[in-house]
């Protein structure tokens, strides 16, 4: 069976996204996820012991914390958090902070959608080993 992969205009999808977390595609070794943080909202301080994480910011303003170091971010910026680093993303602006993130390896169950941070906290999920294809 031929694998299809995933091809899309990620900027448009990220800008249209209103969900706190929306898993688009899960491969064997990486996962593409859209995120939107409301004004003043944050992902929450966390550590992924075995997962590297890439962030790309499409709109809004915020701060990324990586092992205690604070970095301001805006449209066009990116950040990479190495596995084992304590990190957080905070929306410091008055508008939504829109971003996509790539986990390597995957972190969430494929096709997971959590409309709000509260939903994500109530229904945490860990990757079950099943990729999109």
Functional labels for PLM-detected ranges:
Residues 1-29, 115-133:
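A short, N-terminal "cap"/entry segment at the start of jelly-roll beta-barrel domains
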Residues 10-45, 51, 102:
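A short glycine-rich, His/Asp/Glu-containing loop-to-beta-strand
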Residues 28-30, 38-42, 61-63, 70, ...:
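Short, charged/polar surface micro-motifs in flexible loops or helix N-caps
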Residues 51-62:
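Glycine- and acidic-residue-biased ligand/ion/polar-headgroup-sensing regions
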Residues 69-83:
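Short acidic-glycine-tyrosine-enriched beta hairpin
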Residues 83-109:
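Ligand-binding loop in jelly-roll beta-barrel domains
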